[in-house]
Amino acid sequence: MSGIDPKRFGKVAVLFGGESAEREVSLTSGRLVLQGLRDAGIDAHPFDPAERPLSALKDEGFVRAFNALHGGYGENGQIQGALDFYGIRYTGSGVLGSALGLDKFRTKLVWQQTGVPTPPFETVMRGDDYAARATDIVAKLGLPLFVKPASEGSSVAVLKVKTADALPAALSEAATHDKIVIVEKSIEGGGEYTACIAGDLDLPLIKIVPAGEFYDYHAKYVANDTQYLIPCGLPAEQETELKRIARRAFDVLGCTDWGRADFMLDAAGNAYFLEVNTAPGMTDHSLPPKAARSIGISYSELVVKVLALTLND
């Protein structure tokens, strides 16, 4: 194990559930995190903010929290701000990094200004003339395209659009989830990868090969036919450089401690970063446990390592 006395952590709340579209994933993540911490002898307890007021954390003597909430207020800076107010240390990024990390639009603006490569994109606002915007966007970006709400995670409501005729309906659907919709040029030819970060540890890259069109919600959490390639098959020098860029993509957003950065490669091997995740899934389908396991780090050891980062705050 980590060599840290479990008593140093004090009473720990595992935050999971919540009220976002990712509630069910969070419940699964949280239960596994809870068991992993308990397996290491840590005094960990379940806590669902959808069912109990956050003030109970302070009232009941919790001193730190493992945030296994996904999406919504669990990942957009709100829970982080509340925990700061109550003086409870927590895993993952603070208010700024969490808020930026969940907002794909502002993430891309920061990356454009700091030299992190990201696919060309356009934004559409809820209520725009979707047919007119679709014509303009196809002329600028071509096809195929990805349409996604700016602030949903786990690929919720993400659609791949292959024809101009299908774009207006995709825009309308995405706009029911967020007032800002991102329309992104699809990067083809080199595959999808993720870089998992845990403190000073850059875990091995994972190449994701979904059975369907792309790595959507079903492929992430339901299907058993998605392939996860570790090692990812890239030359060592290229993998090292991609890890460096992933770390920069994470850092320039103000993200800290642990998370994930997802990117595509084109046919020439150029990387284009899609998003970061500041509270990654921790289910049996999730990527950080897979990456850790590939280098001999067990699930329990990983969650203890993540929680141990709160000792350094």
Curated annotation (Swiss-Prot):
PROSITE patterns: ATP_GRASP (PS50975), DALA_DALA_LIGASE_1 (PS00843), DALA_DALA_LIGASE_2 (PS00844). Its cofactor is Mg(2+); Mn(2+). Mg(2+) 1 binds at D262, E275. Mg(2+) 2 binds at E275, N277. Pfam families: Dala_Dala_lig_C, Dala_Dala_lig_N. Its EC number is 6.3.2.4. It is found in: Cytoplasm. It comes from the Bacteria. One of its GO terms (cellular component) is cytosol. Residues 108-308 form the ATP-grasp domain. Pathway: Cell wall biogenesis; peptidoglycan biosynthesis. It is an enzyme of class 6 (ligase). It catalyses: 2 D-alanine + ATP = D-alanyl-D-alanine + ADP + phosphate + H(+). Binds 2 magnesium or manganese ions per subunit. ATP binds at residues 138-193. The keyword Ribosomal protein does not apply. The keyword ATP-binding applies. InterPro entries: ATP-grasp, ATP_grasp_subdomain_1, D-Ala_lig_Van_CS, D_ala_D_ala, Dala_Dala_lig_C, Dala_Dala_lig_N, PreATP-grasp_dom_sf. GO terms for biological process: cell wall organization; peptidoglycan biosynthetic process; regulation of cell shape. Keywords: ATP-binding, Cell shape, Cell wall biogenesis/degradation, Cytoplasm, Ligase, Magnesium, Manganese, Metal-binding, Nucleotide-binding, Peptidoglycan synthesis. NCBIfam families: D_ala_D_alaTIGR, PRK01372.1. Belongs to the D-alanine--D-alanine ligase family. HAMAP family: Dala_Dala_lig. Cell wall formation. This is D-alanine--D-alanine ligase. It comes from Burkholderia ambifaria (strain ATCC BAA-244 / DSM 16087 / CCUG 44356 / LMG 19182 / AMMD).
